[in-house]
Every structure is written in C-alpha cells, then in structure tokens.
Amino acid sequence: MKNYLSIGVIALLFALTFGTVKSVQAIAGYGWLPDRPPINNSQLVVSMAGIVEGTDKKVFINFFEIDLTSQPAHGGKTEQGLSPKSKPFATDNGAMPHKLEKADLLKAIQKQLIANVHSNDGYFEVIDFASDATITDRNGKVYFADKDGSVTLPTQPVQEFLLKGHVRVRPYKEKPVQNQAKSVDVEYTVQFTPLNPDDDFRPGLKDTKLLKTLAIGDTITSQELLAQAQSILNKTHPGYTIYERDSSIVTHDNDIFRTILPMDQEFTYHVKNREQAYEINPKTGIKEKTNNTDLVSEKYYVLKQGEKPYDPFDRSHLKLFTIKYVDVNTNELLKSEQLLTASERNLDFRDLYDPRDKAKLLYNNLDAFDIMDYTLTGKVEDNHDKNNRVVTVYMGKRPKGAKGSYHLAYDKDLYTEEERKAYSYLRDTGTPIPDNPKDK
C-alpha cells in the first residue's frame, strides 16, 4: 500500500447507504436480507478482487466485514483474525479510532481468498495492495495511510467504511524445507449433515481426536478415514449410516494453505513434508521443538438406516396432463401446454385475477396470455391413455363488459346453487370431490 490507499468508488458508494447492513449486502449482490437489523458497531466492508501479477487475470474474493469496535483478547486476535496491533485506542476527546495495520488487512484478505478455493492448484498468494485500493466513508472521504502503511478510522458515529479496489496476487509456491520435521501427529474431526430433511437429527459437538503419529511420507487412506467417521457416527447418532463424503481437508500446523483431498474418489494422503515446529517455552523464554500436527477435517452426508435418498428430480410420482384450450365455434386451438402434477385435485379451474388459485391447473380465461375476452362454455373433454391425460377446454367469447372470471363454476359469491350445478362440468372429468362437504 502506498502512502495512500487510492481509489475511485463513486459508483459503488452511490448504491451504498452507510449505517445499515442492507448496504453491505448490496455490495455482495445476491442473498441480501432486508430484515437484518441495523449495525451497532462501525465496520469496514472489504470488497476487493485479485489481479494475478504480470497478467490482467482477475481472481474473485468474497466480500467480508471487519468490526472496528471489537477488542482483541489479551494477546489474542479479533474474530476477523486481526492481531492486537489493529485495535481501537483512546484519544483525548474520548473517541475510539481504530488503527488498521496493513499486514493485518492483507492477511485477512488472504484468508478470505483461500476460503473460496476448492482444489490444491487454485491457491493464490496475496502480495500487496494494488494502486487503486482505497478506503472511503459514506460521504466519499478517502482515508490515507500513514508512513507505516496503517490507516486510522473513526468509530463514531457508527457507520460502514469501504475498502475497494484490487490486491496483487501470484500462484502459491511452497518454500523449500530447511529443517525437516521427523513425525506428525494426525488429528481428526468430523461433521455430519443429514442428506434428507430430518427434524430428528441433532448435530453433535465437533470433537478432535488423535488418530496416530506418522513419519513424513507415511500414508492414510480414504477408507481408513471413512471407517473412523462411521465409528464416531455409530456412537453419536446410532441408527444412521454414512451416505457420501462431502469434503476432506488437511490443515498443516495451522498453515492457511491446506491440502484439499478428493471427495468423489478414493485417495491416499501422504503426510506432507514441512519445517520442524517450534514454540516459546513460557517459563524459560527459550524456543523449543514441539509436535507437528495434521488436522484432517471431514464432512459427510448421512441417512437414517433403511431410508432412501431424496431425489428432487424424481418424477415417477407425477402425472402428465396435456391441456388444450379450443374456440368452441371455430375449433381453433387457442393455447396448449403439458403439465406434471402430483395430485389430480389440482385439475381445477383457476382465476387468473385471483392469486389464491395458483395451485390450480386450468384457466377460466386466457387474458394473461394476450388471448382476450374468452370465457368457459361448460364443455370439457377428458381423454386418457397409458401415459397421458388430455383435457380439452372449449371456450367462447364472453359478453361485452363481463369480467375475466365470468362463468367461474365455483365462485359461490357470484352464482346461485342452480347456476353452480349447471357449470359443474369438472365432475365429468373425474376430478376428486373436495374433502370439505361444504365445497361439494
């Protein structure tokens, strides 16, 4: 980042109304939630893309937010992963500005970039901010960086700031190992999700267990991991079985660049070569060797034993209808359509002017299709074959000035009982009698 975070974000700021979460979702595009409550703390919205160094190729990065008023725990980090260096600090007038360190911002963007990766060859490393990176407030004011690259933002009044522009990235390459680790503790955690809608399933607490200690280059197979997952499932959710693997990811010594294992085929994981891990002894202050770790995190879809997976594309239970609308005087085909429905109860007339009739399959007028002034005549033909049911509705021009729902057979508010019986032609199509006797 230069001495300033430069950018032009006028177009985006036009759509951004600072002070509400709605504006944040406007940056994100899809999925914004108008019912979310307004923000209570000032936030920095990071909406950036990556530019691959030496090319014009862009890399997508999901937008995210940084809470500018959250205090990191003693020596810890905020929920965005910012170090204690990036934190609010008191001033003489009592306001609490928030100092954002350049390194912390780049690290947060790096984590968000990695969160989108689904294969090991898709990793990019964030190098630096591009020249168009800028932080602005709701009024378009640009906040410039200090000489050390940090930016200080006010937190009062509560508002949302915007970091927009680009970061420079390059394909990630592992560094040569200088001091190789001898062994690695392989830890395991698993998460289960029901494949079918299941109100009985209660997710268990994620627990991490030590599987084994392996040397660099030793292996563990997908079958071993599957057996481990099923063993845990048998204890936490008896009566369920694993249907399929959703993901398997290995985190190496808390490195953000993880190994993504195949989810749709068998695999063998070879323990990755890496540097020997060290930590500072809190009593002596001396750097000492510590255990290297691989955390294998898996997700599986599960089913109740004996249950079949729900197939949203299964149409075996649906019935095919061909609906034809014909001019009763000329036999001209006005409109034809084929429909699939799970219930013949839907074979009833709907009023295009009444939204309560959405589930019904037949139209009492065709105005919505720009076929104007037609109405029902009471003549309906119903023909069946092995795979199809053809319903032909004969229509005629309705009297001048009559509304679109003229001759609607079940409009009890407009027609007498005698008139309703005269137009109850659907009874001849085999449509089931309503369950409610009052509707007969």
From Swiss-Prot:
Q: Does the keyword Signal apply?
A: yes
Record-annotated membrane-spanning stretches: none
Signal sequence coordinates = 1-26
Does the entry feature the keyword Aminoacyl-tRNA synthetase, yes or no? no
- One GO process term, biological-process aspect: symbiont-mediated suppression of host neutrophil extracellular trap formation
Q: Which GO terms describe its cellular component?
A: extracellular region
Pfam families xrefs = Staphylokinase
Keywords linked to the UniProt accession: Plasminogen activation, Signal, Virulence
Question: Which InterPro entries does the record cross-reference, listed alphabetically?
Answer: SAK, SAK/SK_sf, SK
Q: What does this protein do?
A: This protein is not a protease, but it activates plasminogen by complexing with it. As a potential virulence factor, it is thought to prevent the formation of effective fibrin barriers around the site of infection, thereby contributing to the invasiveness of the cells.
Protein name per its UniProtKB record: Streptokinase A
What species does this protein belong to?
Streptococcus pyogenes serotype M1
Q: What is the lineage of its organism?
A: Bacteria, Bacillati, Bacillota, Bacilli, Lactobacillales
